[in-house]
Every structure is written in C-alpha cells, then in structure tokens.
A protein has these predicted regions:
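Elongated, amphipathic alpha-helical interaction scaffolds
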Residues: 1-317
C-alpha cells in the first residue's frame, strides 16, 4: 500500500470524517448520521457460492474494501440500519462501477448467507421454496451504500455508471441491461458553496486538493478559511496529495496551514526571481551569438547548458 493510500485510509476511517462524507452525500450536509452510531466492520467481502447437486463444491469469492461501517440512523423514535462503505481513490479507476458493484453484490451475498445460517440455527419451519434458498419470504437485507472519494486534483474522467462502460449497438437494449451508478466525491467538481457543506477537516482537505495546482487560489482558500488549524491526519493527507511541506513531527497534534502557505508563496517568488535571472542571461548570450561575438558552444558553456538545449532556448527568444 502506498503512502497516499495509507494516510487517506487512516483519515477517512475516523468516525467524524466518515460521517461527514455521507452526510454530504445523502443529506446535503445535514448532520443526520452521528459518528458515535458508527461501528467499524470487517472489510473482507467473502461469500460462499452455493452449488447445487451432490458432487458440486461450494466456491468462495473474496474481495477487500477500504472501509466499511454499520450505521444506525434515528428518525423520530425509529431506527434505520444500513451499511456504509468508502473507497479511497488517489488515482482514477476506469472500471470503478464494476468494482463497486462487485463489493455491494458480495455484501448482499454475505447477508443472505448469514440470514440463512441463522434460520437453520433457529430451526424455523420453512416452505419448500424458503428451504431451497435458505432466505425466507419475510427476511430483509440491510441497504449498502458505497462512496468513492477521489483524492486527486485532476477531474474524474472515468465512467460513473456501468452503462458508460458499454456500447449499445441497439438502443432498445439499454432498457434491459441493468445499470449501476457510483456515488462520487470529486474535489475538482466541488463548487465553493458545496465545500461549505462539510463540517470537519474533510472540507479543508478537499479544498486544498481542489486548488493545489493554482497557488494563488490555494493561498486565498486557506487565508479566507477560519479553520486552518488541522489535526495531524488531515495534514498528512494534504502533504501526501498536494506536496505542500508541513510540520508533521511526532509531537505536533495540530498543524497551522497559513505558515505553510507563506513558505510556499515565498518559494514561488524566489523561483520567479531565479527564472527571471536565467531568462536575462539567455537573452544576453543569444544576442552575443547572433552578433557573432560568441559561438553557440561558448554561449552554451557559459549558460551551463548543452549546445542542443541552448539552440532550443534561442529559438524561443
């Protein structure tokens, strides 16, 4: 597992951040899912494919999710139970709809197998049809929602549905082929008002990723944000994804982002000055070559460049 994968997984595993992501996705930022009502589950999706007949053996299918939690959502005095999974993507996965569909199908398969085993244990009297499936008419599954969180500055350009991964020779076929859509949070696609719907440091993480390729916009986002004292896990994600240098020493529990931005902007100014000096030297040497005072070989030597690189630079001046 890469460093980016490790730090994003540790960050999103925190119940407060996990709940924040799903409250944005499902409830438009309203705090309905409570962190204290989340329970982490085994991320191994293992299901036994039950074979029919005496000589056929059961086969196992196994996959590993990033994060899976059980959630209890209280509405009035009623409790709704569901399973929530997050897939962290530091790179775009062009088969994500199929991947998520497999995870969800295996989870439902797990639930069917567990319910069937419980029915046998309780020695319930089934009908013939219920006996064959092990899953009784009155049994219910818990809903599963899987969220893809893209930790990248470039816009997600992969498919977001199974249908997008297919060609339909006959348009009439589309209606009869089941679609599967992914739920995606993509920093590049988030508008400023949407970032405000996040209530934890997930907002700062997504914002820093969104603006990471534009130093001026990144500086503005951080300076206009009142919550730029970030916990260490959030800061680790920002540094790993955006390459902003932060003080992540072990004794530090919170990181001040404004200082990092000041340092970044100062480095940018120094780089600009250095580039300006280099351009000035190249301009002068090019003039001397064109006036016949220096050979290309001598000018390239003075510029600490190869002759071919110097000739290429001359063409741009």
């Amino acid at each position: 597992m890469s460093k980016k994968d490790t730090v994003t997984k540790a960050f999103m595993r925190e119940n407060t951040v996990f709940a924040d992501a799903f409250n944005y996705l499902i409830f438009n930022g309203k705090k309905v899912i409570q962190p204290e009502r989340l329970q982490e589950l085994d991320t191994t999706e293992l299901v036994q494919l039950i074979a029919k007949g005496k000589n056929n053996k059961n086969e196992s299918v196994q996959k590993y999710r990033d994060i899976l939690k059980a959630a209890v959502i209280m509405e009035d005095e009623n409790a709704d139970y569901l399973l929530l999974g997050i897939e962290n993507q530091t790179e775009i996965h062009y088969a994500m709809p199929v991947r998520n569909m497999i995870y969800d199908a295996l989870q439902y398969g797990n639930q069917v197998a567990a319910i069937a085993a419980q029915n046998v244990k309780e020695k319930k009297a089934p009908t013939r049809a219920e006996f064959l499936s092990g899953f009784y008419k009155a049994d219910k599954l818990r809903p599963v929602i899987t969220l893809v969180l893209h930790f990248g500055a470039d816009p997600w350009d992969g498919a977001t549905s199974l249908h997008e991964m297919m060609d339909f020779p006959l348009e009439e076929m589309r209606t009869f082929i089941q679609d599967y859509k992914i739920h995606l949070i993509d920093p590049a696609a988030l508008e400023p008002d949407e970032l405000e719907k996040f209530s934890t440091s997930l907002r700062e993480v997504l914002g820093c990723i969104k603006y990471s390729k534009d130093k001026e916009k990144l500086s503005s986002f951080i300076r206009n944000n009142t919550r730029m004292m970030l916990e260490i896990n959030a800061a680790r994600v920002i540094q790993a994804i955006t390459n902003i240098t932060l003080d992540l020493s072990e004794e530090v529990e919170e990181v001040v982002m404004c200082k990092a931005i000041d340092d970044m902007m100062q480095d940018s100014r120094e780089e600009g000055k250095a580039e300006g000096r280099t351009e000035g030297i190249l301009f002068a040497l090019t003039g001397l070559v064109r006036d016949g005072v220096l050979s290309i070989k001598d000018a390239a030597f003075r510029a600490n460049m190869t002759e071919s690189a110097f000739e290429a630079a001359m063409k741009k001046i």
